[in-house]
Amino acid sequence: MDRKMLKSKIHRATVTGADLHYEGSITIDKDLMEAADIIPYEAVCIWDVDNGSRFETYAIEGERGSGVICINGAAARMVAPKDLVIIASFVNMNNEEALKHEPKLVFVDDQNRMLPARKEVAGQGTLKKVAW
């Protein structure tokens, strides 16, 4: 049996731009792509923390060290600059591989600079509660 597993994610990155008239994709700082093991044209899921939008696109390399996270094409209507997003990639693997798998987790600050590596913490964490 194969399982679809989280391969990597860039957690709570700040959107730096939204370019409606570009052909599509998400432009990601090359340093962040390498840290998250995402290659050009790889499919990624984007989850907007601020408005709940969820969509899939593909990654293209942005300038190394720039902190760029730019949503391109039609998906630009689903985000706004300064929104926080989670960028996730997935991989299929057999059950034996899946049981040993550790995803690459990339945490960033509000300028999309990498923070020290750490394990993901389950539960409520320290985030503010959302008032509905």
Curated annotation (Swiss-Prot):
Entries under InterPro entries matching the protein: Asp_de-COase-like_dom_sf, Asp_decarbox
Reported cofactor(s): pyruvate
Protein name: Aspartate 1-decarboxylase
UniProt pathway: Cofactor biosynthesis; (R)-pantothenate biosynthesis; beta-alanine from L-aspartate: step 1/1
Active site: S25 (schiff-base intermediate with substrate), Y58 (proton donor)
Record lineage: Bacteria, Pseudomonadati, Thermodesulfobacteriota, Desulfuromonadia, Geobacterales
Binding site for substrate: T57, G73, A74, A75
CC terms in the record's Gene Ontology section: cytosol
Source species: Geotalea uraniireducens (strain Rf4) (Geobacter uraniireducens)
Record carries keyword Cytoplasm: yes
